Amino acid sequence: MFKRILIANRGEIAVRVFRACRELEIEPVVVYSQADREALHVQLAEQAYCIGPARSADSYLNVNAILTVAQAAGCDAIHPGYGFLSENADFADACEAAGITFIGPSGDVIRAMGNKAAARKLMQSAGVPVVPGSDGAVDTAEQAKALADSIGYPVLIKASAGGGGRGMRRVYEPEQLIPLFEEARSESLACFGSGEMYLEKLIVNPRHIEFQIMADGQGHVIQLGDRDCSIQRRNQKLLEESPSKALTPELRERMGAAAVAAARAAGYVNAGTIEFVLAPDGQFY
């Protein structure tokens, strides 16, 4: 059990982690930007450190400042919450190098799952169903068009490094593919610094189903149930319903087993989410 944890976040998640630390009799240490000095998590804490000005890049994304505070305060772990540095592989590596536990997956796992084209291959090797599409990245718009012609339209162009709907385009007609591919690639380069793209068959009118998983680092992985995240705006979830009314007991069991297999294949440790697309015909990917 940890003795002292630095919470590298703000707002609701910082308060929730703070309360969890108190319940477990772990001493919480919080950080804040100059704009958040009156925030609730700061008011609750006995140890609170300013890590920079209001701009997130200079505070909550400032790896050196956060690690300096963690070491000075004698923290043996850092909880990143969500957003900010929670999926930053370099930060996870920096914590390990400093002898501080990063409460989350390792840097290698973050990198492996952060590249969606590589993650597709990993899931296929583990027997987890993936949406029909490219085997890895596609290098050119012409290659993407040839693949789309073979699997049939509509298709989905996706950025390997993408997220939040950026670097993604739906293509319904062959003549749309090349211009939309270049458009998606340009957006991906601007947003993520990578122009690597891949292609999938577009599942029309799907449900977005997630399974919560936990892995302890000793080979034990469990799933803790499902939630339906299909109500979205611009590819961002608005509401989650748990459990999903769309799943039969048999389908829920199969998807839960696939979620556990996916986490094992990735070598995932800690709490996490495995996301599925559920097609109208009951097939999941």
Which residues are covered by each model-predicted region?
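N-terminal beta-alpha lobe that positions the nucleotide/phosphoryl donor
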Residues: 1-285
